[in-house]
């Protein structure tokens, strides 16, 4: 309730912190740790390329609570902007998706109340994968749109560019290549 209503109403923004500098997309390679001490956890480590982190208020962060259990030792926590020891780095420049900030997050002995554990200890990997599965369809849709846009621009270009006295779009080989590309995009759209 404390976090859901502000997020659902748009009064606060949230993000999802899984990727780490030394683990990349290998969630099992997490090095961020959360050690339970009484009624709280102490979080140490870092995350990188965390989408929307530059303006978020609430962060779902994944950390190892038991390294001996591999992915079953990963837990999920709610971290609030401004918690002592929690810092948000500068936006990381990248080639695409520039509308969203992507920053590094650093945790230096961040005290996280035990009530900020999402689910139970060891359920973090399952939570992360369920979240990623939902987001992957969006990434696929973006990629499909980019591919279609590239084909549309190519069609314009081959209709204007001349070689040997005629547009290169009039050559049979060019038509075959464009038809093949369009067929692949259409097939992807039907998935």
What are the residue ranges of the model-derived segments?
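Short Gly/Pro-enriched turn/cap motifs at secondary-structure boundaries
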Residues: 22-25, 49-52, 66-68, 94-101
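Glycine-rich beta->alpha junctions and the first turn(s) of the following alpha-helix
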Residues: 76, 86-187
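Buried hydrophobic positions in well-ordered alpha/beta secondary-structure cores of metabolic enzymes
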Residues: 16, 34, 43-45, 61, ...
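Internal helix-loop-helix
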Residues: 1-10, 51-58, 70, 137
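A short core secondary-structure module
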Residues: 40, 44-88
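FAD-binding glycine-rich core of flavoenzymes that anchor FAD
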Residues: 1-20, 36-39
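N-terminal glycine-rich flavin-associated loop
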Residues: 1, 24-27
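Cytochrome P450 C-terminal beta-domain/meander region
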Residues: 26-44
């Amino acid at each position: 309730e404390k976090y859901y209503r502000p997020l659902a109403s748009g009064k606060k923004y949230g993000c999802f912190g899984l990727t780490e500098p030394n683990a990349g997309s290998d969630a099992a390679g997490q090095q961020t740790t959360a050690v339970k001490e009484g009624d709280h956890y102490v979080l140490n480590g870092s995350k990188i390329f965390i989408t929307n982190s530059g303006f978020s208020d609430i962060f779902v962060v994944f950390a190892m609570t038991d390294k001996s259990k591999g992915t079953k030792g990963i837990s999920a926590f709610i971290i609030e902007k401004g918690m002592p020891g929690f810092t948000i780095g500068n936006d990381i420049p990248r080639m695409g998706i520039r509308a969203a900030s992507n920053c590094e997050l650093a945790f230096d002995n961040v005290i996280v109340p035990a009530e900020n554990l999402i689910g139970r200890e060891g359920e973090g990997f399952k939570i992360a994968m369920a979240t990623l599965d939902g987001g992957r369809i969006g990434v696929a849709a973006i990629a499909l749109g980019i591919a279609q846009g590239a084909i549309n621009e190519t069609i314009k270009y081959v209709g204007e560019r001349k070689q040997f006295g005629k547009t290169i779009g009039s050559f049979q080989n060019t038509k075959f290549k464009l038809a093949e590309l369009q067929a692949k995009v259409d097939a992807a759209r039907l998935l």
